[in-house]
Amino acid sequence: MHAVLKKMKNKLVVSCQALEEEPLHSSFIMGRMALAAKQGGASGIRANSKEDILEIKSTVDLPVIGIVKRHYPGSDVYITATMTEVDELMEANVDMIAMDATKQKRPKQSLAEMVAAIRNQYPSVALMADVSTLEEAIEADRLGFDCISTTLVGYTAYTAGASASDNDFALLKEMVQAVKAPVIAEGKMNTPALAKCALKAGAHSVVVGGAITRPQQITKTFVEALQ
């Protein structure tokens, strides 16, 4: 098991991301958000873009799972979709690279080609497969990813409306049984109770984003509850 994954075993990773259209979009703010997460006990940070990661790395000494979200014409894959994004992340010295490992059409290289290229050029970095189905998890495991995450359950056209926590984390349990790599619970982990249930279901660790780092999303849940 990769050293980064050992540090995250049975612990919380906080996703600190704010896209351009969001109020907290700022590398400085994401660095502060990561510091707050560390002070709260997080064991790692997931972050988007070279700029944000450099700021976070200068602010906290936690392992960083890096992604670059970038859209390409004719493809629904936007999480670290090509080697261009991988190179940017390595310039920020990330500890782990997460990428879309779904069966959706890719903009350039195949997933297998990307994994081979990364292993050749950057052999020390850990790789996380963001998947949406059991089939994708099994394929990612075959390709040699260091860990597999349920990040994209509900976010592909063929899993729309689904969540990793559905049916008492049935999908996550199936993945844990079917693959050798550790499985990370991520996506719509909106409460501490859900996060705890994910670990009980066999998750190696839990990634929580919006429920901690997106104030507009948190506010909306309160507003809707009062209506």
Swiss-Prot record:
One record GO biological process: N-acetylneuraminate catabolic process
Keywords: Carbohydrate metabolism, Isomerase
Residue stretches spanning the membrane: none
SUPFAM superfamilies (UniProt xref): Ribulose-phoshate binding barrel
GO CC terms: cytosol
Protein's pathway: Amino-sugar metabolism; N-acetylneuraminate degradation; D-fructose 6-phosphate from N-acetylneuraminate: step 3/5
Similarity-based family: Belongs to the NanE family.
Function: Converts N-acetylmannosamine-6-phosphate (ManNAc-6-P) to N-acetylglucosamine-6-phosphate (GlcNAc-6-P).
Name of the protein this chain belongs to: Putative N-acetylmannosamine-6-phosphate 2-epimerase
Organism expressing this protein natively: Shouchella clausii (strain KSM-K16)
